[in-house]
A protein has these predicted regions:
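Active-site nucleophile elbow and catalytic-triad environment of alpha/beta-hydrolase enzymes
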Residues: 41-61, 66
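Catalytic histidine-centered segment of alpha/beta-hydrolase-like enzymes
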Residues: 104-116
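Short beta-strand/loop motif that positions the catalytic acidic residue
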Residues: 63-64, 70-72, 76
Length: 126
């Protein structure tokens, strides 16, 4: 398993819980919410939110021994680093490694970040 700035349950944890009550009411009424992030707008449908609630994983244990590699930017302001740490806890039997990228943001799109990602993927595949 490779997680890059992983955000399971992001609809609830990173969107719904941060909305004000009036925004939640409007979301429920219109059946969608226009999320603004980093200069972009994303249409989040209510059906997507409800589907995400059916697929929660952070309250379970995954007893697989598959290797778990997580990489997370230290300056990620979209997904908190504590979420990657929480992911670690759901894999009690796995061999785990987390790399925190100094200066890395959520996209990890600097050339050095992309090289680091490519090297990690190559290690897992080969």
């Amino acid at each position: 398993f490779i997680g890059i700035g992983s955000a399971p349950e992001f609809l609830d944890r990173l969107i719904w819980q941060k909305l004000k009550n009036n925004e939640k009411k409007l979301f429920l009424k219109k059946k969608f919410y226009m999320l603004k992030s980093d200069g972009y707008e994303y249409k989040i449908k209510l059906a997507f939110l409800k589907d995400g609630r059916k697929n929660k994983v952070l309250n379970k244990k995954i007893n697989s021994k598959i290797p778990v590699f997580l990489i997370h930017g230290k300056k990620d302001d979209v997904v908190p680093l504590k979420l990657s740490r929480k992911i670690f806890s759901i894999f009690p039997r796995a061999k785990k490694k987390m790399e925190i990228v100094k200066g890395g943001d959520h996209s990890l799109s600097r050339k050095g970040d992309l090289n680091r990602l490519a090297n990690l993927i190559n290690k897992v595949i080969y």
